Amino acid sequence: MLFRSLVLTDEAVRSLDTNVKMNPPLRSADDRESLRDALRRGAIACVATDHAPHARHEKEVPFEDAPFGVTGLETAFAALHTHLVLPGIVSLETLLERMSAGPARAFGLPEPRIEAGITANLVVLDLAGEWTVTEEGFRSLSANSWALGATLTGQVAKTVADGRVVFER
């Protein structure tokens, strides 16, 4: 399940902002609510992002000429935390399970765990940090995000992969 389908609806496309031109396309509010319900019930096993960055010039064209795709790595957790966890739609535990153990199972990887003797692969989260999404905050090659200008709560503070800190805010 792509995280943006749990947050946005097809109403966002009315602006013809090329940063909301994505595939699969956004759906109705009723569809979004059905997906949220499926997430709550456990029918959705993992939530991810397809992260499709595009150069600015590719998106600064009329809507119909712009390529499909948006970034998502920098905003996925914060958007879901803000729009699903804080209003009580799903628990933090459910969100974290669907964004970590769920994808690991889907790809046949060992489920993440913190244990002595196990090489660390984890993120440290700042659950209270409120921030505004700006182009300068992106580490990706581009910032073609539907979330530009949005205020979100919660963000990744540190990422440890194979026992090494690979990102730190």
Predicted feature locations:
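His/Asp/Glu-enriched, well-ordered alpha-helical/loop segment
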Residues: 19, 41, 46, 52-128
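A generic local structural motif
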Residues: 31-35, 109-111, 145-146
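Short helix/loop capping segments that flank catalytic or ligand/cofactor-binding pockets
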Residues: 8, 168-169
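A short acidic, glycine-rich active-site loop
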Residues: 20-30, 67-72, 145-151
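Short acidic, glycine/serine/threonine-rich loops at helix termini
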Residues: 8-14, 57-61, 135-137
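C-terminal cap of metal-dependent C-N hydrolases
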Residues: 62-65, 119-168
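A conserved active-site cap/scaffold subdomain adjacent to cofactor or substrate pockets
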Residues: 12-47
